[in-house]
Amino acid sequence: MKKSITTLDLNLLLCLQLLMQERSVTKAAKRMNVTPSAVSKSLAKLRAWFDDPLFVNSPLGLSPTPLMVSMEQNLAEWMQMSNLLLDKPHHQTPRGLKFELAAESPLMMIMLNALSKRIYQRYPQATIKLRNWDYDSLDAITRGEVDIGFSGRESHPRSRELLSSLPLAIDYEVLFSDVPCVWLRKDHPALHETWNLDTFLRYPHISICWEQSDTWALDNVLQELGRERTIAMSLPEFEQSLFMAAQPDNLLLATAPRYCQYYNQLHQLPLVALPLPFDESQQKKLEVPFTLLWHKRNSHNPKIVWLRETIKNLYASMA
């Protein structure tokens, strides 16, 4: 027999959404400002209503059942529409509005000043919180700690960072694609040699530790060729690798996205860019789609929609 929503306490749906986000009774209780016991009682009521366990315990926390997974997007959309209704009287002039972004650096630094100006023009009382993109950023989006992420993914078939590998709860839009190139100081001895794979591998390299990994698609392509680069230094950010490659008498090579030319121009780094010495099919595996990422529950959030369009317009020249 079909159940009527009039017999369901709608507060239970908020509890259900937070349990899906947090995968923890304790964390959901903290966000609701109630005790874990109260959340457990709410979960028991939800299980009775849906006649399904909804979540089972696992080593990583609460694991959703197939029914719960199938309801996630509908639940998020329902909660989003509820929030829009509640915001109607005052959302035109929000106070205390906060924009929380996680972005690859220096990608965001290129346009941060322009982006902040547009935000403050529209929302004068807003605050902006920017964090570096790292291994936890996708989970932070899922947890609701980040509104939008802006980062590069990978194209190599064996990569863990493919767009097709993103969690089902994450929506995305590719703003532009980039092929990395090799950055070296203007008086580097490699510039006096024939630029080929042997020259590229003859010199020591700076690697970027990306989402807890020191290797990426470049190393996969080299492995397919039976070759390997010498990694002399591992750094967390592209701008650090560019800074080190630009130092006098430094033989280090940095491999970084082509868009870094904008960053280099801003900071007047004495660097030259050379193409990676690979054929077209190998270059294709190294393409980096730079992508906006957000949770599906925010797909119709006016603040997030406006922010997505603003970032998209700012980076249109790089497409």
Swiss-Prot record:
A GO term, aspect molecular function: DNA binding
Residues covered by the HTH lysR-type domain: 8-65
Keywords of this entry: DNA-binding, Transcription, Transcription regulation
DNA-binding region, residue intervals: 25-44
Protein family: Belongs to the LysR transcriptional regulatory family.
NCBIfam families documented for this protein: PRK10216.1
Protein purpose: Involved in anaerobic NO protection.
Full protein name: HTH-type transcriptional regulator YidZ
Native source species: Escherichia coli O139:H28 (strain E24377A / ETEC)
